[in-house]
């Protein structure tokens, strides 16, 4: 069982429950260049909430991306992930990329009007959530896990949302 410190947080440990092993990866040596796809997530695991965008600039391990805010929350503590573009949608005024978040590669620490910024190879403080769903009518039990990037304003909503999503599966 994972220990949580007195403030209710734990540092991200790149290990997962068996149900997460195929999707939960950490890449300590990730490299991004301007134009690369990048993701930002506030939850990661069996349930993920986040967005993807484009890297604007790289200075060593520091990156600037999106060119617009994610949630416009200032100082933040989110997962940075790599991302894979799987399709595009064209439009007359603007187009969109369809992408998936991938491996955890760092921490997003700024979410400002001009974009998001973060550091490769550092990781956010997180709150681990594990939900066990027992369906007596089907005679089966499933366990789901996720990590929520520590943010007091989102913690209750996201943990409740993860529990609800687990019940809905």
Question: What is each of the regions a protein language model found here?
Answer:
Residues 1-169:
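Terminal presequence/propeptide segments associated with secretion/organelle targeting
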């Amino acid at each position: 069982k994972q220990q949580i410190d007195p403030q209710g947080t734990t540092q991200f440990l790149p290990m997962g429950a068996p149900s997460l092993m195929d999707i939960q990866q950490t890449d300590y040596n990730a490299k991004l260049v301007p134009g690369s796809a990048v993701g930002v997530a506030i939850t990661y695991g069996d349930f993920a909430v986040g967005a993807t965008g484009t890297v604007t600039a790289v200075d060593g391990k520091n990156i600037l991306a999106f060119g617009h805010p994610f949630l416009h929350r200032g100082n933040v503590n989110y997962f940075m992930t790599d991302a894979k573009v799987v399709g595009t949608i064209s439009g007359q005024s603007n187009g969109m990329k369809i992408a998936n978040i991938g491996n955890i590669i760092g921490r997003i620490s700024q979410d400002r009007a001009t974009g998001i910024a973060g550091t490769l190879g550092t990781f956010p403080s997180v709150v681990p959530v594990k939900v066990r769903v027992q369906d007596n009518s089907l005679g089966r039990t499933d366990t789901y896990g996720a990590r929520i990037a520590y943010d007091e304003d989102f913690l209750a909503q996201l943990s409740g949302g993860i529990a609800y999503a687990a019940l809905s599966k």
